[in-house]
């Protein structure tokens, strides 16, 4: 439910339950670098870890969580924890509206250099993705991240999707971010999943799966720690090579999703803008026929 306001989400909750979904994934709720309704990608250009933007306030989030809970639905939030919004015409420089706490210390930032080789783990985890990269390994930055997530937990959030999780290093690579973060969360049993798309190394995927569920379009060696999708916001909305499903019909995507549900434990259905396919009876039927342990996220 990306870029939906509170009323739209609340109105959709009863139908989501009727369709057999177990959780609703809400788009980023962090303060954005610019006000007003913008392109979809602006939701991934936050100023830091302050909660509340043009789509949802703290009160909205709390109300949504309470109403969803009354329908036995969990609420998940899409979180941007490793970068901020960029300055106009200078992709790797933080926007002037970025939180002053972050701007004040150069140690809070990655080197201003983009990833050049996505097959090179060192390159991926130490450099930027065409946005200003945060040094999430710095204890003060990690403290801000933990406080942000715990504030959402206090509002009733039961799960988090971590955007671009692939760019955050693992213990075998010398970084303890993931175990440290999980230990810092005030509630156990949260559903945590991270975007680790196009990663070919099964060893890397397996290590991520020790800490978070791995979000992707194909199964890794730990299927019970995978969250699979037939389409994501990136694959539908992106204009570059990432937009590999934008020419597929909603019906094609739905059929692919139903096939995933029949065979895999955790699945995510992306709701296209102004598209009602998620209400199709075929999805409800697929959920009813799925394994009982399956977790279905809209």
Feature map (PLM): residue ranges:
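Active-site-proximal helices and loops of the catalytic beta/alpha 8
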Residues: 13-16, 30, 41, 63-77, ...
């Amino acid at each position: 439910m990306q870029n939906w306001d509170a009323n739209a989400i609340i109105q959709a909750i009863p139908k989501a339950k009727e369709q057999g979904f177990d959780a609703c994934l809400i788009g980023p709720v962090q303060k954005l670098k610019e006000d007003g309704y913008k392109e979809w990608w602006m939701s991934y250009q936050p100023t830091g870890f302050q909660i509340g933007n043009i789509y949802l306030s703290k009160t909205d989030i709390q109300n949504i969580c309470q109403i969803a809970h009354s329908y036995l639905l969990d609420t998940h939030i899409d979180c941007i924890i490793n970068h901020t919004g960029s300055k106009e015409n200078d992709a790797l420089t933080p926007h002037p509206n970025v939180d002053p706490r972050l701007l004040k210390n150069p140690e809070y930032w990655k080197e201003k250099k983009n990833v050049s080789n996505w097959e090179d783990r060192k390159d991926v985890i130490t450099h930027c993705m065409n946005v200003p990269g945060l040094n999430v390994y710095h204890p003060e930055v990690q403290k801000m991240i933990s406080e942000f997530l715990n504030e959402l937990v206090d509002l009733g959030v039961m799960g988090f999707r971590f955007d671009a999780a692939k760019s955050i290093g693992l213990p075998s690579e010398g970084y303890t971010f993931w175990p440290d973060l999980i230990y810092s969360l005030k509630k156990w049993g949260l559903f945590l999943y991270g975007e680790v798309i196009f990663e070919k190394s099964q060893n890397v995927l397996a290590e991520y799966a020790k800490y978070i569920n791995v979000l992707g379009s194909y199964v890794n060696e730990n299927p019970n720690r995978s969250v699979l999708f037939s389409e994501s916001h990136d694959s539908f909305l992106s204009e570059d090579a990432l937009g590999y499903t934008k020419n597929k019909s909603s019906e094609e995507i739905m059929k692919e999703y139903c096939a995933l549900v029949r065979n895999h434990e955790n699945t995510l259905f992306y709701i296209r803008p102004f598209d009602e396919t998620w209400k199709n009876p075929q999805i409800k039927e697929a959920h009813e026929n799925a394994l009982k342990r399956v977790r279905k996220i809209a």
